[in-house]
């Protein structure tokens, strides 16, 4: 099911009101219980990327980051992983073209999506096995930003994820972090990556949860 081209163009419009209105329509569009293809979401993220690109004021950047991450639970569950997977694919593809003045807002956007993933895991684990939901997300991350065979994926994104991972995890589980394979994507990359910089730097930047005080389901 393809997103209409005019709709995507409105998301990347120069006029902020046009972009905001398109974003409201997007919520209804994504909530449909209809299957999307990978290309559909890649086209959509192209528009959303430039929507973020043109956000020039800090408060609006924060609001937009929150609004985009808030799309995750709105997306029909059968499309949810693909929606996030294509987000990370878009970040990896566009990263080298982001100038230094825009880097921080995209770091913020990635932080919000990391948090949205953890919240979705928490919500879904109320009706499904936690390990199963975490495994589904881990597969998405290891096929995407943590794919060790993708030598072109920017180190900066992985370093940022290492910096924020546990912080965002603890926000979702402020008291007890349930036992699960939360760090499997990092462990896999550290173990198998041919990138020496990643193997040496990721362990130093990753602040792991030292103890689990709550068993998984």
Curated annotation (Swiss-Prot):
It comes from the Eukaryota. It is found in: Nucleus, Nucleolus. One of its GO terms (cellular component) is nucleus. Its main location: nucleus. The keyword Metal-binding does not apply. The keyword Thylakoid does not apply. GO terms for biological process: assembly of large subunit precursor of preribosome; rRNA processing. It holds the Pfam family Nop52. Required for 27S rRNA processing to 25S and 5.8S. Belongs to the RRP1 family. This is Ribosomal RNA-processing protein 1 homolog.
């Amino acid at each position: 099911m393809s997103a209409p081209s005019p709709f995507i163009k409105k998301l990347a419009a120069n006029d902020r009101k046009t972009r905001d209105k398109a974003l409201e329509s997007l919520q209804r569009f994504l909530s449909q219980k209809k299957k999307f293809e990978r290309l559909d979401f890649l086209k959509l993220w192209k528009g959303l990327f430039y929507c973020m690109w043109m956000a020039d004021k800090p408060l609006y950047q924060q609001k937009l980051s929150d609004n985009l991450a808030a799309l995750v639970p709105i997306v029909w569950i059968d499309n949810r992983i693909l929606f996030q997977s294509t987000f990370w694919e878009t970040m990896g593809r566009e990263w080298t073209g982001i100038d230094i003045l825009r880097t921080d807002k995209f770091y913020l956007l990635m932080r919000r999506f990391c948090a949205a993933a953890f919240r979705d895991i928490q919500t879904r684990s109320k009706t499904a096995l936690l390990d199963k939901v975490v495994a589904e997300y881990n597969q998405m991350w290891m096929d995407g930003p943590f794919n060790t065979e993708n030598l072109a994926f920017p180190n900066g994104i992985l370093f940022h994820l290492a910096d924020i991972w546990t912080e965002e995890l603890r926000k979702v589980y402020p008291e007890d972090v349930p036992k699960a394979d939360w760090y499997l994507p990092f462990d896999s990359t550290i173990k198998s990556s041919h990138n020496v910089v990643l193997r040496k730097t990721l362990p130093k930047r990753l602040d792991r949860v030292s103890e689990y005080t709550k068993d998984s389901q």
